[in-house]
């Protein structure tokens, strides 16, 4: 199926918010279409967003895990947004902050009406950790489709990559939801075209019939 081309390189920073309540004030929850990116600290989330948008500095990368503490919103075009959710799972972050982040993530995934797809990024060498699974279950409960990316795929040889991918696809069946598992490497571009196609399809599916008709009639 052909979808309207998305110009990811036009993405620009819109706002940051500490939680869903602040986000709702600036962007009504029913407005537009949002695709969220989430992952453990240093899973390669910021690098993936930068590669997708062809912008090295759009999402700030850091050698210090746990640096992303806010919900960061980027707009590609009016009504189409990418959401950079706080990184999670870093051991040196205080417990109170961990719990706050997890609460913020859960509320966003379960309550944000404009969310139409979730990309979960996991280091291919440490996939489907407990918090990754919790995130995916939250999304499934909210009827949100999930793309699970095994990042840093270039760190493994091709045979090991394929073996891990097949194993993780089998594990993903246990979620009993719409969970697709793929390889990804920001460095080598592995899986980039697939990511573009998936996000584009989510934007298309998230459009209301009236919006789609308006675009056709223009």
From Swiss-Prot:
The protein's name: Probable GTP-binding protein EngB
One cellular component (GO) term of this entry: cytosol
Function as written in the Swiss-Prot or TrEMBL entry: Necessary for normal cell division and for the maintenance of normal septation.
Binding site for GTP: 39-46, 66-70, 84-87, 151-154, 184-186
Highest taxon of the lineage: Bacteria
Gene it is expressed from: engB
Cited Pfam families: MMR_HSR1 (PF01926)
GO MF annotation terms: GTP binding; metal ion binding
Swiss-Prot/TrEMBL keywords: Cell cycle, Cell division, GTP-binding, Magnesium, Metal-binding, Nucleotide-binding, Septation
Family designation: Belongs to the TRAFAC class TrmE-Era-EngA-EngB-Septin-like GTPase superfamily. EngB GTPase family.
Organism: Psychromonas ingrahamii (strain DSM 17664 / CCUG 51855 / 37)
GO biological process, one term: division septum assembly
Binding site residues for Mg(2+): 46, 68
Record domain EngB-type G: where: 31-205
Coiled-coil ranges (or none): none
Organism classification: Bacteria, Pseudomonadati, Pseudomonadota, Gammaproteobacteria, Alteromonadales
Cofactor section: Mg(2+)
